[in-house]
């Protein structure tokens, strides 16, 4: 898989990351991602920290912004059968550049499909989310049907779960998608 956000976050081997939800009352919500050594890799802040509904930020362990993700709004969005989220990374000059678009079906009787689709860059590169995120049982699958990441339940806890990423997968992209899933399902990044 080609890097979506940065090749700095791609690994040559499969990795298991642990996600810990932060309570809204303590840190404004969001979550922290650690590696197997319990070292912080990413922090995700939602509207409890940012103060803006429909906006998320993925940061590296040093607090540098990697992805700005926001929900599209406006009249066209209101008439659409999908909610649309856009993810932006920052180029070397600090300017935002579009990285991915995630579409999830709005909860309505007009929604034909329940699939969540992520489009990446120019061309027809896309990913789908299979399974149900709130149950901590879902996968991000590429257009060829290959699983690139899996969200799995951590036994006995809703606030901690694990994410297994396959080799050569951009973990910043994966956790950007997971941040949106967390928000869509009203979890730690939502207001």
Swiss-Prot record:
Might be related to the phospholipid scramblase and tubby-like superfamily of membrane tethered transcription factors. It comes from the Eukaryota. Signal peptide: none annotated. Belongs to the LOR family. This is Protein LURP-one-related 6. Gene3D superfamilies: LURP1-related (2.40.160.200).
């Amino acid at each position: 898989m080609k890097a979506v956000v940065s090749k700095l976050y791609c690994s040559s081997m499969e990795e298991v990351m642990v996600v810990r939800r932060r309570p809204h009352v303590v840190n404004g919500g969001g979550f922290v991602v650690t590696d197997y050594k319990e070292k912080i890799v990413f922090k995700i802040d939602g509207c409890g920290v940012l103060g803006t509904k429909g906006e998320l930020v993925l940061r590296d362990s040093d607090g540098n912004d990697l992805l700005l993700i926001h929900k599209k709004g406006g009249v066209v969005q209101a008439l659409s059968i999908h909610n649309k989220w856009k993810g932006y990374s920052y180029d070397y000059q600090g300017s935002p550049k579009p990285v991915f678009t995630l579409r999830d079906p709005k909860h309505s009787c007009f929604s034909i499909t329940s699939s969540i689709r992520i489009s990446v860059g120019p061309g027809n590169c896309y990913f789908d989310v299979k399974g149900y995120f709130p149950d901590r049982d879902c996968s991000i699958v590429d257009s060829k049907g290959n699983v690139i990441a899996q969200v799995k339940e951590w036994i006995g806890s809703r606030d901690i779960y694990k994410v297994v990423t396959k080799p050569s997968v951009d973990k910043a992209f994966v956790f950007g998608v997971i941040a949106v899933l967390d928000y869509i399902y009203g979890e730690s990044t939502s207001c």
